[in-house]
Amino acid sequence: MPLQPPPDHTWAVRIIALGLAVTALIFTSTRDTSRHVGDPSHSLPFGGHYRDGSKVIHYNSPRSSKPSNHTPYLLFAPIGIILLIHALHRLGNSAHICRCTHCMPHSQT
């Protein structure tokens, strides 16, 4: 029986890590953490006005007091971070030595 190297599980680990990252992203982006306003029969989670006999509820939405929306910036943040890391790696490593065959100068004989 010949000796065989153990199986390489790097692709399985990468797929599992990617799945966990996507799951965490979806969980955190779809979670509603706004405070509960109103009673069980009259809930106003996104703001509004309700009047019923002696009960009056007027609640402004959390976003109405702060109209700034940072969603477009959050979409481009990962790309910006990747580009920043790449630029810092290129600028900080001035003594870059490439040992691959296509980077080495060909000797002309």
Swiss-Prot record:
The keyword Transmembrane is annotated on this UniProt entry: yes
Localization terms from the record: Host endoplasmic reticulum membrane
Alphabetic keyword roster: Host endoplasmic reticulum, Host membrane, Membrane, Transmembrane, Transmembrane helix
Regions that span the bilayer: 10-30, 72-92
Matching Pfam families: Plant_vir_prot
GO CC terms in record: host cell endoplasmic reticulum membrane; membrane
Lumenal topological segments: 31-71
Topological domains annotated Cytoplasmic: 1-9, 93-109
Miscellaneous comment: TGBp1, TGBp2 and TGBp3 seem to act together for cell-to-cell propagation. TGBp1 is the main movement protein that physically cross the plasmodesma with the viral genome. TGBp2 and TGBp3 would facilitate TGBp1 function.
Recorded family membership: Belongs to the Tymovirales TGBp2 protein family.
Stated role: Plays a role in viral cell-to-cell propagation, by facilitating genome transport to neighboring plant cells through plasmosdesmata,.
Name this polypeptide is given: Movement protein TGB2
